[in-house]
Amino acid sequence: MKKPSQTDVVVIGAGIIGSSIAYHLARYKLRVTLLERGDIASGSSGACDGLVFLQSKKPGIHLQLAMESRRRFDLLARQLPVPIEYRETGGMVVIESEDELSAMQQFVKEQQEVGLDVSLINRNQARKLEPQLSKHILGASHSPLDGQVNPISLTQGFALGAKSLGARLFTGVAVCGIDTTAGKVSAVETDAGRFEADVVINAAGVHAPEIGALVGLDIPIKPRRGQIIVTEFCSPMLRHCMISAKYIAAKFNPEIAQTIGEGVSIEQTENGNFLLGSTREFVGFDKRTTADGLHRIAAK
């Protein structure tokens, strides 16, 4: 039997959240072990778009965290050992109907009241910023603070940055159990050995309920599939990251998505690819792309 490995903190899951936690704890000189049953960014963090989009957040803790997160990206771009392709492109929420305009007027007002740099602009102003926009839109909300990042590179940067600071990174390692002593975590059992630690952080994403169940915790997370179309490289056509007002409505009111549609998000990466998204489907852990899902995105 292998001798147990001792560490201060075990982080389960090397997606963007787990890798970020490991990196920042390692900067505080803690002994950190990062466990991942697949590879770095092999789950949701490697299958998402790259929007750093403040306008889609409701005032409150989500917008507060998003604003603080955005302030850190320039520093992270300099600190991390991997180019993360962060760009502050500005962002727009495109408004296509009077109902959307009314809703966005209130939404923008609430965001402005908590300090977000965002404003409503009319059709002509929006099309001046983005000439590719349809002449049939009513306008948009605009923030110069929105941007994009490469989520895979960012996750790899956190994980490899943590490793360079002394953290241990194990990929292809599955967690089998979590031991407790007197009501406290004492060790994590894996198929590669036992890791003794006083702190275990569950950053397993959609698999967090499986980890929670090992210590009797019911974690209310369900997987949701979001399909995205990725195009071939194109010449620069889009200056801003954009989403539709329908996207925000569907995000906060999933039950109305069947009526109004899921909306659309669109961005052009630094390399020229367009990312067009996305669907919102509760289909368990089915990761397959579907003709119907891609058709719905393309039809938007």
Give the residues covered by each predicted segment:
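Short beta-strand to alpha-helix junction loop
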Residues: Q64, V94-A103, H142-L160, R288-G293
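N-terminal Rossmann-fold NAD(P) dinucleotide-binding loop
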Residues: G18
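Glycine-rich FAD pyrophosphate-binding loop
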Residues: A26-G46
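Dinucleotide-binding Rossmann-like beta1-alpha1 core, especially the glycine-rich loop
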Residues: D49-L129, G263
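Active-site substrate-recognition segment that forms the wall
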Residues: Y23-H24, G50-F53, V82-Y86, K184, ...
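Beta1/beta-strand and adjacent pyrophosphate-binding region of the FAD-binding site
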Residues: K3-G15, T33
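Helical element adjacent to the flavin cofactor pocket in flavoenzyme catalytic cores
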Residues: S141-D198
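Gly/Ala-rich phosphate-binding loop of Rossmann-like dinucleotide-binding domains
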Residues: A22, A26, G161
